[in-house]
């Protein structure tokens, strides 16, 4: 009797394992399809205000994606999940806004032939039925009418370049407990948003600092983050002329760069870099909204802003001999 009772318990423990079989459907081509949204647009002056929302042109066609569910799938209905890595900053009219950068939030509305209109991110949305779901054959993911909205969170000058990134990864499953492991398609975006408010820096010319020849051993002697002995900082005054920006407006200038280590712009020689500072020698941290030089335009919407620069050791090591350069960008913003 004890032995029979033990076998019965073993069978009962086994049944849930068979029921826990996960149905994760995949793209019929084996890799996720990218559905790309070009955000490039031109705002007018009234659009470039905090809180303003701009609806971009609708992508009205079907996304053109087919999914396949694994063999052994029971039932012919599916669920769809739209997952993002971005934080939701707020909602309005159903739209859930995600932070795209320091100036803009983005949100999307999608229409499905069965589920109707919904606003991602959302998980396990009940979709319709298709006979191919249980047959291990392709079936259409019937998303269409993708509508993208942009909300201004900070006024900007000239333009904002939005690098390519994935906004949503879209998963197809058959239950609300299936893991979200393999996306069927992704929704990505990039673009450039231009505004009428513009400022020309240094009459459109490159601001260049040339420090001549510096002994390689001086960098290793200086140590990480320090200027080589005997090398002086250089100062320049940058002219700024703005258009469609109100006279006497308070603006700021800051530094943007691609290769950065703390407050240092790393050069094409990884052991060497440059520090950009305000006229008092306080370093500016690249790509940091709060590290800036405030200034006020005059009655003709112009200004003069002083900056300083000097070379530093990035690693504390002796750099390879040869010419080294670094590139950064001066960006003017509303204060």
PLM feature spans:
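Intrinsic-disorder-associated interaction segments
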Residues: 1, 13-14, 141
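Bacterial N-terminal signal peptides that target proteins for export
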Residues: 1-8
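Cleavable N-terminal signal peptides
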Residues: 9-10, 20
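N-terminal signal peptide c-region/cleavage motif recognized by signal peptidases
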Residues: 15-19
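Mature extracellular/passenger domains of Gram-negative fimbrial/pilin and adhesin proteins
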Residues: 21-335
